[in-house]
């Protein structure tokens, strides 16, 4: 199990390194395609504990428009990059 996880993470890192050398293409992700892509990208990404979150009053001040929008707004209604999708992991 651990070996599989390490291999998967290695493939992800190599893929991200390779893709960062080229200009990333923005695409639309909707419905099951969005859910499956997020599941594939976020596999193995641990959720942050509550202690790592900033207090509510602080986060609302700095979230800006990102705090009011969701992954569907950013990646289904308009094209987004894999980096944007990765920002929703964890």
UniProtKB/Swiss-Prot annotation:
Any Pfam family hit: Insulin
Keyword flag Disulfide bond: yes
Coiled-coil positions: none
Transmembrane parts of this sequence: none
Gene3D superfamilies per record: Insulin-like
Biological source species: Bombyx mori
Annotated S-S bridges: 30-76, 42-89, 75-80
Record's protein name: Bombyxin B-12
InterPro entries linked: Bombyxin, Bombyxin_B, Insulin-like, Insulin-like_sf, Insulin_CS, Insulin_family
Keywords: Cleavage on pair of basic residues, Disulfide bond, Hormone, Secreted, Signal
Signal peptide bounds: 1-20
The keyword rRNA processing belongs to this UniProt entry's keyword annotation: no
Residues of the propeptide: 49-67
């Amino acid at each position: 199990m651990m070996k599989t996880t390490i291999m998967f993470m290695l493939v992800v890192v190599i893929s991200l390194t390779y893709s960062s050398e080229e200009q990333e293409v923005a695409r639309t992700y909707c419905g099951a395609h969005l859910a499956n892509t997020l599941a594939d990208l976020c596999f193995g990404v641990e959720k942050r504990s509550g202690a790592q979150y900033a207090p509510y009053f602080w986060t609302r001040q700095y979230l800006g428009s990102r705090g009011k929008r969701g992954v569907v707004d950013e990646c289904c209604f308009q094209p987004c990059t894999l980096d944007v999708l990765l920002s929703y992991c964890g």
